[in-house]
Amino acid sequence: DVPDDHIMAEPVCRGTAPGIAWGAHRISMFDSQAALIAVPTDQMIINDDAFRKNVLDGMAFVQQNNYFLTMGIVPTRAEPGYGYIQINSHVCGNIYKVKTFTEKPDREFARMFVDSGEFVWNTGLFLSNVSYLRECFSEFLPDVLSSLDTETETLSPSQEEHFIRKHFPVYPNLSVESGVLEKTGITCVMKCDFGWADLGTWHGIYEALPKNMEDNVV
């Protein structure tokens, strides 16, 4: 069972940056040296064992290094509905520095990305140690973390949630990629092989699921 104070519900949608900032704040109250993984819900993981290995390897990396580590998948087709990460210099193992992020390019650019061999799909999964994550949020999104740190430090989880319901709607509507990851200059990407599909669109669902003889998904 998951304790109640480990379950946090955003009162309104404000992109991934504010929600992750709140989650990191709560986690740091329990363990300031923790490593965390941010996992979007609208996706499919095909190979659980490979995913578990990639996550454990990634956790070990961010516990030893102050980096954001995104998880990328080598693309199998030119998919304009996905985000893409351009890889840069090699760091270690299957980990590389990130050169660029591109969100949902048109089909022609997606095809160029795939043909170049320099890009992986952006799964939206990323890892970091909590200390470095909070340091970066304090630098790049101070209006998010400063109020959490100064005004909720002595609050109970229920009191903190009351504070969030009041203040969360005025937080910036930003993804963590555009709000933080693209600004640090030292984000890394792991080339993963666990099999992945984005289920955020009907097309993504169609591509991920088996088809019948008429090429339909039921």
Predicted feature locations:
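Left-handed beta-helix
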Residues: 130-218
